[in-house]
Amino acid sequence: MEAKKEKKYMSDIHLEDYTEQYETGFATVDTMIFEGGRREELLNGGWHYAVDQYDTCLRQKWYKERYRDEKGFTVPIDYSFDEWPVMQLPCSWNTIDPMYLLYEGSMVFTRKFSYIAEREETVFLKVGAANYLCRVFLNGKYVGMHRGGSTPAFWNITEYLKAENRIVLAVDGTRRPEQVPTENTDWFNYCGVYRDIALIRVPKCHIKTFKIALVPDGTFGHVIAKATLSEKITAKAELVIEELGVSRKIQLENGAGEVVFDAKPELWTPEKPKLYDVKVTCGTDTVSDRVGFREIRVNGRDILLNGEPVF
């Protein structure tokens, strides 16, 4: 019988497919929530960080904070989270220190935070933007990843939360042929977590998406509003635009619905960018936004804004 081979501590350095286990939990447009008007608990500020050129955090699973092996013996480690230097996030690391100016590889960021549950709730982690790949770990577990440096990412982290928490972000700014910027381009590649990091608390059943716009019929006198919930239930939402004297109910069936109503808002233009405060409430959840109403059409070679040529 062949003896079981012991895993060598440094064997992970030869792995070529080490990222496959982290190719799940993608943050996409379907995992986003409407964030306008919601209270955000910012995690901005000082984060411990380390350059991780060889993705050792992913290979050796630093995020698990395993300091002893299965037999209880202390193992050599390449990290000590709380002894790392501190970087103020959000930022692009290329602008923080001259020695990182041209660095486009991986960095690991970590910090601790406390959490007190206020009610039966769902908690999302928002990373406003991280260029280019961002993998999230919370309390020793892999949460998910996001590709794309210019869009926000949201993950439902409710099941991972404890009273005291350790969060780790593994950010990879490496250029690749399928990314923007690509490998060879006249475009500086700003890397890092360069927009807000925050927790967003919402009711278990919450407003997931909301849209409002002019009906594109050329009259500029009809408005359509659409909303969806996180659960496929029957409910009613209330839409309010105080300045226009508008208060309408949106009937939601299977968690989605819309309403069309008459209104004559002042139209948005570059010269006079009028905005209206819009609020939507469903149950205990409320979202809000500032909205400009305008219509864009194409007529032959002309681009029309509110019925008038732009050029």
Language model segments and positions:
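Secreted/periplasmic carbohydrate-active enzymes, especially glycoside hydrolases
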Residues: 1-311
